[in-house]
A protein has these predicted regions:
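Alpha-helical transmembrane segments
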Residues: 30-57, 69
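Short beta-strand boundary microenvironments
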Residues: 49-50, 73-151, 158-170, 185
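Alpha-helical transmembrane segments of integral membrane proteins
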Residues: 22-32
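Short extracytoplasmic
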Residues: 62-78
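Helix-boundary and loop/linker segments of multi-pass membrane transporters
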Residues: 10-15, 27, 112, 130-131
Length: 192
């Protein structure tokens, strides 16, 4: 053994507290490294699943409620232009719900369309089964978990009861999807 190896061995056996601190320090650092790499690999797939498989739209254009008919006609012309492959009008509303004891105040986005579904912009699915809006309200899985509701049960939002027809996969945010007919039945009015 060289002199440095002998000194190292002597110090390890002579100062047991330092030895234990070194061992636990190295073990803790390695554990943190593995935890960080594990979290990175778990989260790495979320953006592609959410924004390439589920929400496939490229842009959201909001119409000003106080826009004139001429402004609306101009917007319609732009949307029908050759640069736009497809578009779909939806009504979107942001709601807040407090899940006391679970996750606190959460923001929920309600999306309503006059079509049977939101494809090709949003793909609603549950275990590779495509979902449509013709059966009623579709909510996202995490929202269903927070609210403690399953298919066939009702979710109370803003004093309104929404009967859950389906639960869709989602990785970012909370969403409620419904058709125009469902919206009118629940709220008793057209979406403004």
């Amino acid at each position: 053994l060289s002199f440095t190896h002998k000194v190292t061995a002597r110090n390890i056996f002579r100062y047991k507290q330092r030895m234990l601190m070194t061992i636990f320090g190295v073990a803790g650092s390695v554990a943190l490294l593995f935890a960080g790499l594990g979290i990175q690999s778990s989260v790495a797939g979320v953006p592609s699943k959410q924004f390439q498989q589920i929400q496939q739209y490229q842009m959201i254009v909001s119409e000003n409620p106080s826009a004139t008919n001429q402004d609306k006609a101009e917007l319609e012309e732009v949307l029908k232009g050759k640069d736009i492959q497809a578009y779909q009008k939806i009504y979107s509303k942001t709601l807040d719900k407090d899940f006391k004891g679970k996750a606190g105040l959460q923001t929920i986005t309600l999306m309503m369309t006059d079509k049977e579904d939101l494809t090709p912009f949003i793909h609603l699915q549950h275990h590779q089964q495509e979902l449509t809006l013709k059966d009623g309200v579709v909510i996202t899985a995490k929202l269903a978990q927070l609210a403690g509701v399953k298919v066939g049960q009702t979710l109370e939002i803003e004093g309104k009861e929404l009967k859950v027809a389906s639960i869709a996969e989602n990785y970012v945010g909370h969403f409620i999807y419904m058709s125009q007919a469902s919206y009118e039945q629940i709220y008793g009015q057209l979406a403004q």
